[in-house]
UniProtKB/Swiss-Prot annotation:
Keywords: Amino-acid biosynthesis, Cytoplasm, Isomerase, Lysine biosynthesis. This is Diaminopimelate epimerase. Catalyzes the stereoinversion of LL-2,6-diaminopimelate (L,L-DAP) to meso-diaminopimelate (meso-DAP), a precursor of L-lysine and an essential component of the bacterial peptidoglycan. Its EC number is 5.1.1.7. The active site is at 75 (proton donor), 219 (proton acceptor). It comes from Cellvibrio japonicus (strain Ueda107) (Pseudomonas fluorescens subsp. cellulosa). It comes from the Bacteria. Coiled coil: none annotated.
Amino acid sequence: MRIRFSKMHGLGNDFVVIDGISQTVRLTPEKIRKLADRHFGVGCDQVLLVEIPEQPNVDFRYRIFNCDGSEVENCGNGARCFAVFVRERRLTGKRVIRVETAGGIIELRVQDDEQVSVDMGVPRLLPEKIPFVADQQAVTYPLDVAGQVCSISAVSMGNPHAVMLVDDVKSAPVGQLGPLVENHPRFPARVNAGFLQVVSRDEINLRVYERGAGETLACGTGACAAVVTGRLRGLLNDTVKVNLPGGSLRISWPGEGHSVIMTGPAVTVFHGQIKL
């Protein structure tokens, strides 16, 4: 089976994007791992699949697969690439695109400067909705990680995030703590681990160890979760510049009960075909 695809990235968080509407695509975990392999495949952090939606009043179904073959609920950087892809492939001419994900419906807006704003939905803070094992909802929770107690905030942006404050992201133990937090038993669906440094009320630095992918150059949902965390802790204003290793995003969140809006770039690197 030969599959047409586009290689894209959002701030270095890179994707293989596949049109599953105009061609027949049957992905298995093994095929996804082959696609994502940087030595024997195309190479990417995640594989994104465009499908016909199952719900009414929605334009597309948006599916996300990690490089280990697991399917996840949402990906913010991927959502921006998704919006650019469906327009480039002429699957739609709309600038406002509604898509269904495993984490819910999100709205994508392609701006005149080709930056893409994504309505990431209302963050979920109830532990059972994340999911996270806790007796009651709180802004911060103590988490025992290999005998060390870390203070984290737990947020779902359609996928689960644990965010901890650090003095300096450059020296943060992302590679050591990241996989331990990701697989912590209090997160039954595993979790993305964010390491947040507050620069000012309008700016933060962030590194994210992604569930099933490891540390990436950028994580859109992680940026949203970090701003939500900072806002709940009283550290940030409602619009924040988030600096990630691959570049910067703008995240806006008025507060509880409101959607998080993420704005940033999406770039097509090349188009290709691969036999799977």
